[in-house]
Structures are given as C-alpha cells and as structure tokens.
Amino acid sequence: MESLIKINFQKIKSVGIRVDFNVPIDENFVITDATRLLRAAETIKFIKEKNCKILLISHFGRPKDIFENQYSFQNLIEQFSKILNEKINLISFDDFSKKGLSHFKQSKENIFLLDNIRFFKGEKTNDMNFSQSITDELDLFINEAFSASHRSHASVNQMAKNILSLPGFNFEKEIIAINEIKNSPKKKLAIIGGSKVSTKINTLLSLTQSCSNIFIGGAMANNFLKFKGIPVGESLLEADSDKMIEEIYDNAKKSGCEIHLPLDVVTDKVETFSIDKLSSNSNFKILDLSDSSINLLDNLISKSEIVLWNGPMGMIENENFSRGSSKLASLLSHSSSQVVIGGGDTLLAINIAGINFDQFYFVSTAGGAFLEALEDKVLPGVEALNLG
C-alpha cells in the first residue's frame, strides 16, 4: 500500500482531503462526540507541515442535493477549529456555486472546508464534471473517510480517480485491521450484536469462514434462541429469519466455526433468567446479557488471539440494560488479544462504559463500510485508490 510518508511533496501545493465530519450533535448544534474529527487530525497536521494548502471535503446528514441550513457546516465550523486546534475557513455553498474554488486558490489562509458536499447535485451521482471542478485545482487527493467509502459518490470515488490519490493515515489503519480479521491465521472470535439478522447475514457468513468462534448477542440473539426452541416471550424478533439462521449454522458447521448464544438474560422487569428457565407462558422482553453469558465470553476471549466486536449486547440507552455491554467492554480492554471494534453503537457502548479507545488494538469509526469490507465487498472508496 503506497503511503503518504513516501510521497515527494516538492511539486504538491494543494491537497484535497475527504474527511468524515458527519459528527453527532445535540439540539443546539453542539458536537457530542468528536472521535471522527480527531481521527483525521494526524493526516491534516502532516499535510499542513508540508506547507500545502488544504481543502477539506465532507458530508453531514442527508440533505436533498440542495442547501439546507440545518446541514450546513456554518453551524459547526467554529467547533471544528477549536477541536482540531486549527483555523478552518468555510467555503459556502453560494460561494462555490458562483465562483468555484477561486477563494481557495487566491487566499493566503491554509485550511479550508467546503460546505456539505451533499448539497451539490454531482456528489451522489458520482459525476465526472462536478468531480473535476474540484480536483482540477488540486495536486493530490487523500481519502481519510473510510467510514464513507462504501458510497459510490464523487468525493469518495471519482475524485480519487482524477488525480494522484492516497489513503490517509487512519484509512490505512482501517484497512490493516480489517485484513487482520479476514486473513490472519491467528485464532479469532467474533462478537456480533445489533437487532437484525438480515443486515448482518453476509457479515456472519463471511466470519464463519475466518473465525473459530462467533458469539451472537443483542436483540439479534432472540432470533437464534427462538430458532433453537427457546421461549423469548415478547422480545424483539425479525420475521422470516429462520432460513438465514439455518444458512449461518450450515456454513459454520462446514468451516468448523462454533456459534455461541447467551446462557442467561436480563428481562424488561430487570430480572435475570437462565435460558433454560424462560417460560413460554410469560410476557417478557429480553434486553441484556447476564453473568453466565459474560463468563462464557470471558472464556472465549481468553482462548482467542484476535477478537472482533460489532454491535451492543443489550439496550444500552437504558442503564438497566447496558451492564452486559459495559462488562464486555471491560473484559476486552484488559485482554491480551488484538481487539478490533467497529460500528457506531458499539463505540457508544464503550463510551458508556467509560473506557478509552486507546485500550484496544483498533477502534473503527465506520459502520456500513466496516461490515461491507468484512464481507469482501469492493468498496468504491478503496477501489478508487487501487488498494484491493
């Protein structure tokens, strides 16, 4: 993989960096989690130290191909500057629409942010002309938004094809971590939570080929428990999941991968039951794991060299049902295994547990892109950089 460190910057004066500043905010536009900003900081600082002018490009939310004030970076630019400790200048939607990047070219300032790239009609259509209107003013394009790289959008795919393009430092780390999960001969455990089997079936099928053990938690486990004939009361279930689950078990059996399910659960009445004690006559909802399940996870983790965690183990937004995920986060933070964590809700679970991300081998900020990469899908953002 070609790296930024090896590039000769003698003739490179203007650099575009596709970042992911699609940060969570509260009702007052205050950023509640700056992780994605901070992940781009190393690349931004590196390019700045090369005395290059920087154009940052990002999306925010889901505007409808037109300026919408609630999705404008004008509401967040001051916070971006403060968090990154850099003066960042906004190129507004109107300014770019009328004058292109003329202000970027003529100004003596160093770092600019184009307003929400999804305001522009050429973005989601991966339009060549729109892409060139930006890359014609650049000498180098860097993708530092792995989390958006499953989108075939102009700022992810076409811009990277127009000029010399490279991955950012965090993008490289994402690729390396995912390749470790898929290709390393080390003994691997996948811990998969979330609510729907259908959204993760391809990921699970892929993981049965590379992992020795898979633990299913979260609301998704309800479907697996029901498939095994265990009563789940009024717990959240996905319709027509049996065929998918049967396929997962068949693939796992052929590959020598063992599927593990919770041994005990916490219900909506904050009562703990072993799964063999759940009654078919009771009105209950399964909302978390309990101690026996955590002990099983502890045992599986201790036998694994690489551990992947994606998806919370319970309804973490309620403190009564976040304990299972917090206990798991604590176990993983003290493990000697290479722990790779991915998915927005999983990151929230770690934050709720009060554990620092640097206690793990790697924490991915990507959601859909992370899962699609595990499924061996070709991501448009990766393909454009010729990274495989």
Q: Whereabouts are the PLM-identified features?
A:
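Active-site loop-to-helix "anion-binding N-cap" substructures in soluble metabolic enzymes
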Residues: M1-G388
